[in-house]
């Protein structure tokens, strides 16, 4: 395929046109008075959203050179979303500001490499200062504030803070579509896996069709149990304690299952059997998780253990187990807290190492089950369009809240970026590196300027007053008042602000140091076939 090539100023200018088109589309959504953008969908109703990364991903430009610039900014938004889960619009605004200011200086003869070094030094100083002025987030109210700011809904803030309180910071919080109009929270505490009882005759509550075991022993094995003689010595030991037993095995069949059911019906023994969750290596890992949570040992050939030799020492324990036809929930396992903490640390390190989104999702699920449970926020709305928009907002809020708990919070509304200007301005740099620093100084003002503009105020006036105000005081664009941002609840997670600035500077520097751009030439359209002469159609 033939290529189209542009050099130097022509290359950069074409890319910057694409940057501007995308950024101008996205930045109208910034702040409490930000507008919405309507996205056409190939099927179904249009999507109305103010989520920066969702808008950025939809933009595809006809000009190949402009499209490359737009795609680079879209990459900034996506990367910021992946790291922090929010701040995508801020990242886009910062990228545009750095690129615009940088291009002016490069066109005027400045060295792009020197500018890049200055930008990197200034951003490092800004990030250090952000961490210095950060405040830790703890307590239900503080978490609710962060979530409410990101989602623009106090009710959503309450749901997220309650969910995090119930399942812990590492717990899984999923967002699903509700069948009704109302948004609601549902929490499953303890370790849940999608395997139900092997026989309905094992239920203890015939009305609800569930089996509830109080203070049970738990046998965990990756073997198939077909012969009751294999586990008979262990069953006799458990029977002496007068406590119920949960059996988690590869399968229970043959004579073993009817024997267990018969003893259950006669009232001799309260026992429930379920299949082991997962498949292959993931099954082994999940069984090990259950064993650590309950203080038991997996009976497996990998450890040289056999069912017929199993003793009471291999059994796990928990406060309660609930089993229905589809799922099993283990509540308050008796495992050692330090062993559970070690297991959690191992899973976290595996999550950082993996490059597969699917594997990361499965590891996150395992982490949640060990850490305390799963919460589901069921989103309700009057129309499908409103439902999609609400779901995106709640996802952003959840990610922002997790980021806030992890690294703390700073004043929101772009105020924190203006607060670090003094520290960045104090850097002693020379030549083009000083120019790079000045570019960052100008860019740090841009989010506040855009938020003010979207709300109908003059950004320059707001920024000048903000620079003279104490750290923490800022402009509430929602009502036009000057307030203590943190006290009022206008806050941003440090991780979000930091990621937006770092990713914006990284991609903007790449654009400024670009000297040639190679694009595919569009393929010429194939000529349309001429219509067939009617006289050649045989009179049909």
UniProtKB/Swiss-Prot annotation:
Single annotated GO MF: ATP binding
InterPro entries named among the record's database cross-references: Chaperonin_Cpn60_CS, Cpn60/GroEL, Cpn60/GroEL/TCP-1, GroEL-like_apical_dom_sf, GROEL-like_equatorial_sf, TCP-1-like_intermed_sf
Catalyzed chemical reaction(s): ATP + H2O + a folded polypeptide = ADP + phosphate + an unfolded polypeptide
Subcellular location: Cytoplasm
Any GO CC annotation of this UniProt entry: cytoplasm
Biological process, per Gene Ontology: protein refolding
Keywords: ATP-binding, Chaperone, Cytoplasm, Isomerase, Nucleotide-binding
The enzyme's E.C. designation: 5.6.1.7
Binding site for ATP: 29-32, 86-90, 413, 476-478, 492
UniProt keyword Iron-sulfur, yes or no: no
Major subcellular location class: cytoplasm
Keyword Isomerase attributed: yes
Signal peptide boundaries: none
Function: Together with its co-chaperonin GroES, plays an essential role in assisting protein folding. The GroEL-GroES system forms a nano-cage that allows encapsulation of the non-native substrate proteins and provides a physical environment optimized to promote and accelerate protein folding.
Record note on quaternary structure: Forms a cylinder of 14 subunits composed of two heptameric rings stacked back-to-back. Interacts with the co-chaperonin GroES.
Family membership noted in the UniProt record: Belongs to the chaperonin (HSP60) family.
UniProt-recorded name of the protein: Chaperonin GroEL
